[in-house]
Amino acid sequence: LDKAGQAKAVKRKEGIIEGQANAYGIEAHMEFEYGYPPTINTPSEAAFAMEAASDVVGADHVDGDKEPVMGAEDFSYMLEARPGAYLMLGQGEGTGVHHPEYNFNDEIAPLGASFFARLVERAQPVT
């Protein structure tokens, strides 16, 4: 779930392929195409986003202990360049966003807008 882990997995795959090739007396070659980099939040920005979300929906509705997921995102490139946090705005049950039957829950739009407005208010308070 990070670049070191990714490199370790690639090296391990190469070792397995080499071992199998040696066992069968053949030559083998692996090409690994790296996709998106891992999406890794900056801890302070993730905490900041959780605080803003708690302001909007209450801390009991904010889950900051989600298990890491293997998915990657183009936002990963932004997180490599700048501190930040990628989060998931819960929209209830149903298919995932990349599923062809995905149906956006319009009822969460005001909640999402309130969250993003709160992020701005916390980052740039009016004095």
Short names for language-model regions:
Residues 1-127:
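Metal-dependent amide/peptide-bond hydrolase catalytic core
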